């Protein structure tokens, strides 16, 4: 278990000014979990993850790994503790003049040459590149380089793997393959994985729980499904919208598209299905039941933490009292209703 309590880490911008990269952050990550920490650039997420293995030593606070206070360890004890915390980065950090085998073998100590070769081959098989041991980094694709980095991070059989923007330099297809590999490793090895990213798609794809950071603080945390389906903080809502086709409505409004020009009395709203049990044809039913027109402008369905999350942007047309009853009907069905534009009541 990873337990961070009241972590503070500052950097001096100049003589008289310091910046709180991490400001009073507390976080608990359970064994075997895949936990995401997401935030825009400068939010403090990379500094926070480096506090876990004390690559960045906090100014104050507590860092406990499986009940052991990392801040109080002596240098030799800290070195030993770090061998059980693997880490991968955006830029892979491979040594270009060494083969894949030599790169992966680098952290291994106290083993014979044959034992090292056997261990490296086992790791390369685990990350699905068993035929690359004699290749050099320049001969590998970005995805293959990250697989080598993962193999090296696993060399000492760690319990924890820290991933700092590990897919940011990869194309979407390769990103998906690396995320699937991390999920497989979590299942096979029982690894606790901490994922640092600015991409909500990554969190949605791999994480079970997540925390959202902004200006050095955690502004929202919990189950990924709850964060996606019912974000509470404006920053979180912005992140969620970047992953949904429903966010295109803002572009259509900004461009004054004829698709979204409302007539007097019309209401444009975003409907978000926040529970997995919504299966009725609710648009057509509400249209008939309340005798109003409901026109679908955009629609989207996503799988988040194994659960379907759907949404639509619609325009209601009809008597105001009936529109309001229809929106209340949706709320009663556990559908979140967000009014985007309201053309007012017809005189």
Model-predicted regions and their roles:
Residues 53:
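Helix-to-loop junction immediately C-terminal to a conserved catalytic motif
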Residues 68-69, 114-131:
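Conserved ABC ATPase "signature" region
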Residues 70-86, 110-113, 117, 227-231:
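ABC ATPase NBD coupling module
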Residues 98-105:
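Short coil-to-helix segment of the ABC ATPase nucleotide-binding domain corresponding to the Q-loop/switch region
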Residues 135-138, 156, 163:
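Conserved signature/switch motifs of ABC ATPase nucleotide-binding domains
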Residues 203-205:
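A short, surface-exposed alpha-helical micro-motif characterized by mixed small hydrophobic
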């Amino acid at each position: 278990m990873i337990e961070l309590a009241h972590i503070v880490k500052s950097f001096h911008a100049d003589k008289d000014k310091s910046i709180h990269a991490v400001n009073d952050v507390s976080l608990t990550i359970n064994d075997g979990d895949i936990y995401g920490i997401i935030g825009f650039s400068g939010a403090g997420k990379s500094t926070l993850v480096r506090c876990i293995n004390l690559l960045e030593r906090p100014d104050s606070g507590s860092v406990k790994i499986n009940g052991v206070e990392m801040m109080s360890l002596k240098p030799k004890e800290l070195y030993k503790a770090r061998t059980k915390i693997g880490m991968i980065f955006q830029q892979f950090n491979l040594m270009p003049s060494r083969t894949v085998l030599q790169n992966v073998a680098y952290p291994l100590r106290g083993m014979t040459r044959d034992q090292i070769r056997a261990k490296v081959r086992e790791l390369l098989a685990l990350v699905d590149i068993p035929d690359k041991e004699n290749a050099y980094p320049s001969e590998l694709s970005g995805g293959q380089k990250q697989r080598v980095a993962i193999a090296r991070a696993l060399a000492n059989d760690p319990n924890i793997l820290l991933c700092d923007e590990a897919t940011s330099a990869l194309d979407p297809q390769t990103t998906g393959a690396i995320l699937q590999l991390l999920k497989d490793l979590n299942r096979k090895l029982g690894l606790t994985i901490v994922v640092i990213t600015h991409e909500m798609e990554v969190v949605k794809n791999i994480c079970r729980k997540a925390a959202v950071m902004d200006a050095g603080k955690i502004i929202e945390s919990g189950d990924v499904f709850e964060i996606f389906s019912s974000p509470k903080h404006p920053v979180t809502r912005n992140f969620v919208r970047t992953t949904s086709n429903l966010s295109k409505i803002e572009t259509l409004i900004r461009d004054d598209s004829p698709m979204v020009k409302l007539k007097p009395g019309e209401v444009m709203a975003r409907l978000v299905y926040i529970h997995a049990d919504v299966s009725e044809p609710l648009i057509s039913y509400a249209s008939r039941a309340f005798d109003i027109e409901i026109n679908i402008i955009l629609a989207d369905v996503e799988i988040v933490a194994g659960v379907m999350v759907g949404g639509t942007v619609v325009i209601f047309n009809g008597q105001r009292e009936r529109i309001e009853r229809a929106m209340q009907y949706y709320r009663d069905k556990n559908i979140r209703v967000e009014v985007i534009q309201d053309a007012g009541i017809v005189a």
